[in-house]
Amino acid sequence: AATAQQGGYALSGYLDRLSNHPLESSISRLEGDDYPDAVGVALFMAYEQVLDQLRKEHPQQEKIAIPLLDSLSLLATSGVPTHWLLKLHDDSDIVRDTLSFLKRSSIIQESADGDKTIIHRLQGQVYRETYLSDRKKIIEARTHAITTLNRVNIKQVIGFEQKRQETRNLVEQIRSITSQEHSRPLPSDPNFTLGIATTLFFAAILGMPQLALALAESVALAADTLGPDHPYALGS
């Protein structure tokens, strides 16, 4: 419905476009056949419509939308703290405008408490299967996702409890990435493993050793992925 409204289609016109959209050009179905083809095409059309509108009307927002969607599709399915996403560009107001547009277009949504931004599971899956369909795009998306994590600077967070909460947020993300099959491109990047080491450091100095234990599986995966002799793996 949001796609039809954004594109100015009557229902009959939207259904006609949906039925004639070439499936093979849109869905590569890398993650299993667990939803109807028509659903995949409809979700892909939603992305096409939204990004095309941004490209024509707000080109700077389109450039921001890509790293936003890359990050949301690869990080924790439970959502990403919205204030992290605002740091993806020097102008946080433009990021806010882009997030608002994506929400109005039903591409993303807020968590119940309003603290996180979430991409629906199927939306995320279709995005990965279409826009992240080759190695170059996967590497770019991985960089965007890891940048979102590594721009979290706990040293600059004001307040002891606030620092602890931000550390918990990072631990939640790292644990989710470790357990999510679709997030597996991230642990192969040394910068992600460096982020684990930094998070472990702050968990220790902020008096939360139990959080360090919670990342044992992530440390093991980093060692397996990079090799036990890699300096970042040892740092973890």
Where would I find each of the regions flagged by the language model?
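Aliphatic-rich helical/repeat scaffold segments used for oligomerization and domain docking
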Residues: 1-187, 191-198, 203, 207-210, ...
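A detector of tandem-repeat and repeat-rich interaction/domain scaffolds
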Residues: 209-236
